[in-house]
Structures are given as structure tokens and as C-alpha cells.
């Protein structure tokens, strides 16, 4: 299967499973702990129907939305994922570039492979920082100060 033949989530998942080494695919495809939250979230989509408005003009479609105080062109954002260079050589820079291209927000994990400052300097699109709280309060303080200095727009506590 080639990328140009991917038309839905399952197609992309099948392609990824074929191309990415097993342990890395399982990391991306899996979920935390017992995966109960993943199951509940997935099942909730069974109750959601996307119904297109047919025979209506598309010249004035506005998908912009405000999320966590950030103005986005799309009602989606690229969520933070740790260790992104495992599955793309540019890591967070690739996600930030895609988010900037489409005018949406992207997230950087505190377990990211690219520094907050580097990503922030290259891409001015809204950015959120997924912060893992540590027992070492001085480490927490340093990480929060670094995010603030980089100009991060939104903090997410994990």
C-alpha cells in the first residue's frame, strides 16, 4: 500500500504497521496502562455521526475555532507525543511545520526530542507544552520557566 492510496484512518494505520518497526509502531498505536481510556474514547466515536451539508456552497466555509484561548484555522490540533524522532527524523519540527501550514496548534511533550526553544523560534503557530510533573520541584520550576521563556501559549499537566 502506498500513501496516495490511504483514504481513512485504518488505511494509514495499515500502512504504518507495514513500514514502522514493531516496537515503535506499538508505542504509537498503543495507549497507557490498561488502555481503558483509549477504549472508552474510541467507543464514543460510535455515537458520533459526521453528516455533510450537501448542495450548499463551499466558498464561505469557515472551520476556525478558539481552543484553549488560541485561534485556529481548523477544529483539530496535533497532540503532544514523546520521542517523535523514533518515527520521523525531524521529530517535533515536522509536526510543527504541518501545524503551521494548516494554521492549527501543535503540542510538544516534556519528553520531546527537540527543544521547546528551537521549535518556537522556527514556528509561530500556537503551541502547547505537555508537562510531566516530577518529584524534584527544582526540575519542575526550571522546565516551566524554560517553557515560559520560549513563549509557549498553553501548558498541559500530565
Please identify what each model-predicted range represents.
Residues 21, 78, 99, 157:
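Conserved, mostly hydrophobic/aromatic
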Residues 74-76, 95-104:
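A short, Lys/Arg-enriched amphipathic alpha-helix followed by its capping loop at the start of a domain
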Residues 136-158:
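Internal gly/pro-rich beta-alpha loop/helix module
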Residues 88-90, 108-126, 134-142:
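Active-site-adjacent beta->alpha loops and helix N-cap segments on the catalytic face
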Residues 1-69:
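An N-cap/entry alpha-helix motif that binds or orients negatively charged groups
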Residues 76-79, 104-108, 127-131, 155:
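Hydrophobic faces of well-ordered beta-strands that scaffold small-molecule active sites
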Residues 80-86:
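Glycine-rich phosphate/pyrophosphate-binding beta-alpha loops
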Residues 96, 101, 116-124, 147-149:
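Acidic (Asp/Glu)-rich catalytic clusters
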Amino acid at each position: 500500500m502506498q500513501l496516495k492510496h490511504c483514504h481513512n484512518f485504518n488505511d494509514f494505520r495499515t500502512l504504518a504497521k507495514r513500514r514502522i518497526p514493531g516496537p515503535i509502531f506499538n508505542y504509537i498505536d498503543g495507549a497507557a496502562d490498561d488502555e481503558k481510556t483509549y477504549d472508552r474514547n474510541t467507543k464514543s466515536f460510535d455515537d458520533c455521526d459526521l453528516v455533510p451539508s450537501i448542495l450548499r456552497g463551499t466558498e464561505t466555509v469557515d472551520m476556525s475555532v478558539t481552543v484553549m484561548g488560541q485561534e485556529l484555522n481548523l477544529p483539530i490540533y496535533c497532540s503532544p507525543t514523546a520521542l517523535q524522532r523514533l518515527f520521523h527524523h525531524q521529530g517535533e519540527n515536522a509536526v510543527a511545520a504541518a501545524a503551521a501550514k494548516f494554521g492549527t496548534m501543535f503540542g510538544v511533550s516534556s519528553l520531546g526530542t527537540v527543544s521547546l526553544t528551537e521549535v518556537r523560534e522556527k514556528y509561530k503557530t500556537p503551541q502547547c507544552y505537555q508537562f510531566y510533573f516530577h518529584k524534584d520541584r527544582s526540575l519542575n520550576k526550571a522546565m516551566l520557566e524554560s517553557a515560559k521563556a520560549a513563549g509557549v501559549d498553553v501548558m498541559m499537566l500530565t
